[in-house]
């Protein structure tokens, strides 16, 4: 067994990690989690409307959400912060919606900010992070992707057009099947392939199959994390200790 693990290039720095792996396998260490996750996992439960808590300062409340905020503040012996002045509110709106500071003496114009193309540019960044978007392949060669911008711009336009989330999700998962004659729907499926990609050509059939499985793991894992909030990467080799 040891011979198959021993580094062939006589790099002694590699021996340590292999020894640790062999010891773990031989010791048959138990899983440290006390209970295995199942269908009773908290994030898989049906959404229920919670009971709105009672508060003392009822005049401060404007909507049910305020009840929850104020109830926690009162529980900790705290009082709400004073209402922000118009200048502060304007700065918050600008930075939150478009990520840019307001001009001097600007007044809050919410509809104008939501209609600004900068709104989609700012918030698309967060979705592109979830989608593991990159404009190069990564790995050691890190080749540029000259057409990666098309998916990026589709996300920006979708946000600026206030596309419903269900359509936003469906097109990215199967736009080429749902609307095969719509170039935009096909562009949306860039979500599936916009992650890191090893540009090395496989040296044989075995390596080709391994690389294909790596690609499928990345695709399935990204879809599940993005739209289900669950990690399924581990299912490639074993049951997950924590997620169902």
Name what the model sees in each region:
Residues 1-3, 20-21, 107, 153-155:
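Charged, low-complexity surface segments at secondary-structure and domain boundaries
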Residues 1-15:
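N-terminal secretory signal peptides that target proteins for export/translocation
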Residues 2-3, 27, 42, 189:
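Short non-domain terminal segments
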Residues 9-11, 25, 34-35, 120:
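Intrinsically disordered, low-complexity regions enriched in Ser/Pro/Gly/Gln/His and often acidic
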Residues 15-30:
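Bacterial N-terminal signal peptides
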Residues 35-244:
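Short, structured secondary-structure elements
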């Amino acid at each position: 067994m040891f011979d198959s693990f021993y580094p062939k290039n006589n790099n002694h720095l590699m021996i340590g990690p292999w020894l640790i792996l062999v010891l773990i396998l031989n010791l048959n260490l138990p899983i440290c989690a006390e209970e295995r996750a199942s269908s009773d996992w908290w994030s898989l439960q049906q959404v229920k409307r919670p009971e709105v808590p009672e508060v003392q300062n009822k005049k401060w409340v404007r909507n049910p959400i305020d009840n929850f905020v104020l109830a926690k503040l009162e529980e900790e012996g705290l009082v709400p912060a004073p209402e922000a002045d118009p200048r502060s509110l304007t700065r918050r709106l600008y930075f939150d919606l478009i990520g840019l500071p307001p001009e001097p003496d600007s007044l809050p114009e919410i509809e104008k900010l939501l209609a600004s193309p900068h709104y989609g540019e700012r918030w698309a960044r967060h979705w592109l992070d979830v989608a593991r978007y990159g404009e190069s392949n990564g790995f050691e060669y890190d080749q540029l992707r000259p057409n990666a911008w098309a998916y990026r711009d589709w996300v920006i336009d979708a946000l600026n057009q206030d596309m419903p989330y269900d359509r936003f999700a469906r097109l990215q998962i199967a736009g080429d099947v749902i609307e095969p004659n719509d170039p935009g729907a096909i562009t949306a499926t860039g979500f599936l392939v916009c992650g890191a990609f090893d540009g090395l050509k496989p040296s044989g059939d075995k390596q080709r199959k391994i690389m294909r499985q790596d690609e499928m793991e990345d695709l399935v894992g990204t879809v599940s994390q993005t739209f289900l909030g669950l990690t399924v990467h581990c299912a490639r080799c074993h049951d997950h200790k924590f997620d169902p």
